[in-house]
Amino acid sequence: MTSEQVDAFVQALHVAASNSTKPLVRSTLYTISATPEDAFEHSILSWKAQEYAYRQFSRDSAELPTLARGLFTEVVCENGKEHARIVARGYDKFFNMGELPWTSREAIGRYSQGPYTLSYKENGCIIFVAALSPVRLVITSKHAIGARPDAPVSHSDMGRTWLLRHLEQQNLNEVDLAAELWHRNETAVLELCDDSFEEHVLPYSAERTGLHLHGLNANTIDFKTRPMDEVNAFAEHWGFIPVRYKVFDTIEDVDAFAKKVAKTGSVDGEPVEGFVVRTTMPFTLDVEEGIVPPPYKPGQTWFYKIKFDEPYLMYRNWRELTRTMLRAKRI
């Protein structure tokens, strides 16, 4: 990936954001002040797409140039010339099995190959950690940086609080992690699970409260992420909570395991929301008429998810009903 390719990609985002009165993608500017360690002020753009837009995505789309869900860019000066840089990158938006034509069981069976890695779907909120410079990190939520006017503590601020706790436990610091992520040119993708900060449907014990590391994404235009064994090794070294996962050789093995778990909505007695399935496109892509392929290149990693209706959906429905009743009572 060249600087010119990144420039063209970010320019395509700007064009898409200004295309119509109701663009599919918008940007928000965040300014991060200079520090004694990092002498430059950073102007970071967060790119956010309309949720429905992901369903309309095609590789040649001008209205939505990427499936990335969570994307931060800035302009930097290299050798006297300004270039765009991808600061942090989330996963490509992924969908439930059967939710789109290219996540039908038939499409998955034809356009994926083993091994299939099923990571437990954690029940929190996304935090990105990336390097602003070799000595400085930026911690974001899915689309925002820093404080929020409508909340005493923002997701990104709580993410920073937990990040420093994890690093301190390992006798490491922010500069150490910044140097590593800068060298890798990667974004650490974590799940903030802290019921005292934000309660979700499934509760977390004290030992599983904090930042769960479930991805290391390359800061590239095309989606690229490290395998789970490398992600967990990184988590162990830096003090994050490793994500649980299982590996299967065939899609039939995945189907059998998912069917078994769906009967109870739990694994070893523990309720689970579902699994994120990580697979790759076949290296030789033979498109069959009537079976829509995912919008990925041969050999590229792509995700889909398996979610269970019970007990997770039941818990969520009761929660929403309770909130509705409480709001009505206040009125």
What spans do the regions from the language model cover?
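Core nucleotide-handling region used for phosphoryl-transfer chemistry
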Residues: M1-I331
